[in-house]
């Protein structure tokens, strides 16, 4: 058997290809960013063709960096930014429109009307999700209704939908020449279109959005030896390599953090934050603003479910300090600047740029800086930004404990923001529990590799994967209970100030 597993990690801001050995160690990687297209306020798009070109480049360059060829790979996995919606012509591979990104809020009227009509309760019961701009169903509906010719093309079988996992998979396996149009249960569970109990597209839900069933990819387990086909030799690997694992990014990170037992949780800090709690084979329906989702499904085994708290803006708030406010030149400088003050100076920053996700689900919210005094400066804003990342995670942890009665003993963390040591210390202080960062920080790509390797026998069992995990650093809480309570009370007041800011239109 070949000695390595590859993983495509198609993210919100970049695409990377990583190669791992039997010990789960990184052997080689390459990463490229892609353009963030912002045509209007609240609209966020990506160019699907650019994403596919970046995927080609990173796969070729990672192999070159490692001195490897495609034949050295036993299999590859794919992980991706979830919910981001691509609709393309399967005859040509040409997208009908840019990919509408998960952060995009143009479908707020669609979501509001679903709620007003009472259909929101059906979506929650069947799909485990609230009607929100976040998910794919409304984005597909928007394209069908607003892009000329797409509705007619869909009815004729000439327009298909996929999240970026399906888009990359279809292209890797041949594109117009027999490419496989498929997805996995984790990505499908983020569309508002899949029934969590049947793991199939639900005709009633499809009817809510007016989506023809023929547009949709086949739903497969997250790890399977045959369901996703093989790469074409004409494609970037120049070899026929089995594609045996596909998971949405947060599900992949859950696998990469080896959260295989009920009650185990991880928090990924990236563009947004995503806290996922494994609930086992039990489907737990949230009563406190969380999402019920599929954590993963390996082969023919029953699906494992999870509760998730999705936060739209965390790491991207630091990017805002850099790109819009220009008070730092690099994201890493946020830590240095924030360390020059002892606290937030009474100032709170709620980065509700596109509304608030879990546990509030308020598309009418917008960002706010409150408690501002003449005393405050850029350092206080940097500190308040890091605290906002951590307070939003506390909101989710509180909801998770209410839904599951599970009290976290430690929070496992991963993602780019975890390189910010001050932010992780603040997180431990705000939660009052230790925060643990693993040695291998690229848990999203690693999880996709694990899913692919389990399907091929590269790794035998999840217990073997547990032996790969080790802690790099742990942060212990340092705040007093009084400071923790006062700080959180101030945060909750600040959140209240952001609500009812935007009138959600009726379609």
Swiss-Prot record:
Pathway: Polyol metabolism; glycerol degradation via glycerol kinase pathway; sn-glycerol 3-phosphate from glycerol: step 1/1
Upper taxonomic lineage: Bacteria, Bacillati, Actinomycetota, Actinomycetes, Kitasatosporales
Keywords attached to this entry: ATP-binding, Glycerol metabolism, Kinase, Nucleotide-binding, Transferase
Sequence positions that bind ATP: 12-14, 271, 315, 319, 416
Any one GO CC term of the record: cytosol
Reactions catalysed according to its record: glycerol + ATP = sn-glycerol 3-phosphate + ADP + H(+)
InterPro entries for this protein: ATPase_NBD, Carb_kinase_FGGY, Carb_kinase_FGGY_CS, FGGY_C, FGGY_N, Glycerol_kin
Job of this protein: Key enzyme in the regulation of glycerol uptake and metabolism. Catalyzes the phosphorylation of glycerol to yield sn-glycerol 3-phosphate.
NCBIfam families xrefs: glycerol_kin, PRK00047.1
Binding site for glycerol: 82-83, 134, 249-250
Name of protein: Glycerol kinase 1
């Amino acid at each position: 058997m070949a000695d390595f597993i590859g993983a495509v990690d198609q993210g919100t801001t970049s695409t990377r290809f990583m190669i791992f050995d039997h010990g789960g160690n990184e052997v080689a990687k390459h990463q490229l960013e892609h353009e963030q297209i912002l045509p209007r306020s609240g609209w966020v798009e990506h160019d699907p063709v650019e994403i596919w070109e970046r995927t080609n480049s990173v796969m070729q360059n990672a192999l070159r960096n490692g001195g490897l060829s495609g034949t050295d790979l036993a299999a590859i996995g794919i992980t991706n930014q979830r919910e981001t919606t691509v609709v393309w012509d399967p005859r040509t591979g040409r997208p009908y429109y840019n990919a509408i990104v998960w952060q995009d809020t143009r479908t707020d009227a669609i979501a509001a009307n679903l709620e007003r009509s009472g259909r929101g309760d059906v979506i929650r019961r069947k799909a485990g999700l609230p009607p929100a701009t976040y998910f794919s169903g409304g984005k597909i509906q928007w394209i069908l209704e607003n892009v000329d010719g797409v509705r007619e093309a869909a009815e004729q079988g000439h327009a298909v939908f996929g999240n970026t996992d399906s888009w990359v998979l279809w292209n890797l396996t041949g594109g117009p020449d027999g490419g496989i149009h498929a997805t996995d249960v984790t990505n499908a569970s983020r569309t508002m279109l899949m029934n969590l109990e049947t793991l199939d597209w639900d005709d009633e839900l499809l009817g809510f959005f007016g989506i023809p069933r023929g547009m949709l990819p086949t739903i497969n387990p997250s790890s399977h030896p045959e369901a996703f086909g093989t790469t074409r030799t004409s494609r970037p690997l120049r070899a026929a390599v089995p594609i045996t694992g596909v998971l949405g990014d947060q599900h992949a990170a859950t696998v990469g953090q080896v959260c295989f037992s009920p009650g185990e949780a991880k928090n990924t800090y990236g563009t947004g934050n995503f806290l996922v709690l494994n609930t086992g084979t039990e489907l737990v329906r949230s009563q406190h603003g969380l999402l019920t989702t599929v954590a993963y499904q390996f082969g023919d085994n029953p699906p494992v479910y999870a509760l998730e708290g999705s936060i739209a803006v965390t790491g991207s708030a630091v990017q805002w300090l850099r790109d819009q406010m220009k008070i730092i030149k690099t994201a890493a400088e946020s830590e240095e600047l924030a360390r020059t003050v002892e606290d937030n100076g009474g100032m709170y920053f709620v980065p509700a740029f596109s509304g608030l996700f879990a546990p509030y689900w308020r598309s009418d919210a917008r960002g706010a800086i409150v408690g501002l005094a003449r005393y405050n400066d850029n350092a206080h804003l940097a500190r308040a930004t890091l605290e906002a990342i951590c307070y939003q995670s506390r909101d989710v942890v509180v909801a998770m404990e209410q839904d599951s009665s599970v009290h976290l003993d430690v929070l496992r963390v991963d993602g780019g923001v975890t390189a910010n040591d001050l932010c992780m210390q603040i997180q431990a202080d705000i939660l009052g529990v230790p925060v643990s960062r693993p040695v291998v920080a690229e848990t999203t790509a690693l999880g996709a590799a694990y899913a692919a390797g389990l399907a091929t026998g590269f790794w035998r069992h999840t217990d073997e994967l547990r032996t790969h995990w080790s802690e790099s650093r742990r942060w212990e809480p340092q705040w007093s209970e009084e400071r923790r309570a006062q700080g959180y009370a101030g945060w909750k007041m600040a959140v209240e100030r952001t609500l009812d800011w935007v009138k959600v239109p009726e379609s």
